[in-house]
Amino acid sequence: MHISILGRQPAISIAELERVYGDVSWFSDISALVQTPAEADYIDIQRLGGTQKAGRVVLQVPGRDWRAASLKIVQHYSQAWARREGKVTLGISAYGFTEGPRDIQKTGLVLKSKLKSSGTSLRLVPNQESILSTATSHHNKLGLADNKVELIVVRGQSGIIIAESTGAQNITALAARDQGRPRRDAFVGMLPPKLAQIMINLAGPLSVDPSSAMTQPRLLDPFVGTGVILQEAALMHYAVYGTDLAEKMVRFTGDNLNWLQEKQKDPINITLHEGDAMTTTWEQPIDAVVAEGYLGQPFSAPPSNSKLVEVRGNTNHILSEFLKNLAPQIKTGTPVVLAVPAWKDTEGHFTHLPLLTKVEELGYSYVQLRNVRPDQLLYFRPDQVVAREILVLVKN
């Protein structure tokens, strides 16, 4: 059993885990338990956009008291690491507790003292907060070697879990893929690579169409922009297919994918061409469709009612026509993950697209998730007016 520390918007993060691993459940409001199959007993954190840290569950402690968890840690690891060769680097992160960093650090210091008397050298990563940041975990390589350990201690409703980290999100690689690409365009929106990963994973595990000559599943993005979704899909070893109304965007995506190919020293199966998503006929096969659709114009403050009616009507028309055009071109059961706009008002309420209640008429159904409702899949920052609402659909 594994535990995942979920990202800034936990509902989206747990939905991603459920689509990838299946047997997933909430443990606390910021964490999820994941049952992995025996043949692949780990969480591939570098493939997940919504998991900050992952760990293998080692101990379970009844109750909700930090002292009980602290005693268990000292008792278990003073025995497990006694007379161990080489220095152990240890960090401790405590989630859901009221204790401050000094209390968390104290547990590490007590353990360090006990291990010293049994001949084991321990270096403690200092706690500025009760939780080590993802950056601290990543830069100290915690969870990536036997002698570099982060204990992830999480308090949930049903007790306390102590897990050994199997790694933190690689923020350096994500930043390099985001900012290092040769072609970027703020006007068409900047889809974060993490969100692209989440959306691809929300399509679920993909398999090759047996009637095609392809050796990899092929993923289509019909609003390709600068190619962030295709870039992340290529890193997951999918064949990638992108179209866009603007020739410039198709060119930019080509440049970005060629850059990635050179950087990875790994060939990518790429298909790109111009095309209006409302009318294009795409090449086959298409094993999944993942896209950030047209979001309308950006707003720095909530628009007037008349402006909102205009923008909402325009985006709803484009995205409805796209879904209508796509439906006869894909097979029953094909996943379609689409980010569409939702507009936040001054009270924090959202206005949604009319098409959200009409997906059945357009030829699709919502994928039913056990842990979240479809209306919880809203991706936004507190200061954003236009949120991305993620639709996880399947072709009827």
What residues fall within each predicted segment?
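Generic hydrophobic/packing signal
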Residues: 94-96, 115, 119, 166
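Short boundary motifs at domain starts and secondary-structure transition points
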Residues: 78-83
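Nucleotide donor/acceptor-binding cores
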Residues: 86-90, 216-217
